[in-house]
Amino acid sequence: MTLSFTKMHGLGNDFVVIDGRQNDPALETATIRHLCDRRFGIGCDQLVLLTPPTLAGADVHVRFFNPDGSEAGACGNASRCVAKFVGGAPTLQTAAGLLPTAQDGDLFTVDMGTPRLDWQDVPLSRACDTLHLPLHDAAACSMGNPHATLFGDAFRAEALGPGLERDPLFPERANIGFAQILSPIHMRLRVWERGAGLTLACGSGACAAVVNAVRRGLTERTCTVTMDGGDLRITWREDGHVFMTGPAVTVFHGTTA
């Protein structure tokens, strides 16, 4: 099957975007894994599939797939890329809900919705205080996908990430953030992403880290999050909505053989 695609990235978090709005390719798991493979396929942190919306108010239906073929509920960096790809400040229909977007020059903002803080909604496998998990004292929330944030000055993300992602406390596995608070308006973050491993940036992980930091009184509601790939500006508004602002880049267009 021949597929047209666009390679994009947000702060080095890279994506293969397939526009199926006119003809849904109905990708199988094996095909997704192959396309995401950096040696035998195109290579990416996630594959993004666009199809026609099914909800009123949405401009495009977006699905996010990890390199292992599993589906993610949300991806902040990919959402900014989709906003650029589609144009016109689209509202995205995702498994996490409707995500409005906006553009200001080269920067794209996504309303990531409201975080879910109850243990059942993360979800966790048992009742826990999501602000202080019995797991490295992490804090947890859902941004449409499960996140846990560890706060400290030095973490070996590559060593801790795989085990924490699959800890029995997370029945759906989890994205694991390793955050260092630099000031009340600035943090350093690395994220071990569920199904993808350590990436250069994670938009939903940055949102979760700021939410969890604010809950602990560590930062203000607007915070710059510096990751290996660059900076995002995250704002957790008083009305509960989390806004993520950052760049989106088109790298090239191609067609599979």
From Swiss-Prot:
Assembly description: Homodimer.
UniProt keywords, alphabetically: Amino-acid biosynthesis, Cytoplasm, Isomerase, Lysine biosynthesis
HAMAP family: DAP_epimerase
Catalysed reactions, as listed in the record: (2S,6S)-2,6-diaminopimelate = meso-2,6-diaminopimelate
Name the UniProt record assigns to this protein: Diaminopimelate epimerase
Primary residence: cytoplasm
InterPro entries xref list: DAP_epimerase_AS, DAP_epimerase_DapF
PANTHER family membership: DIAMINOPIMELATE EPIMERASE, DIAMINOPIMELATE EPIMERASE, CHLOROPLASTIC
Species the sequence originates in: Gluconobacter oxydans (strain 621H) (Gluconobacter suboxydans)
Family: Belongs to the diaminopimelate epimerase family.
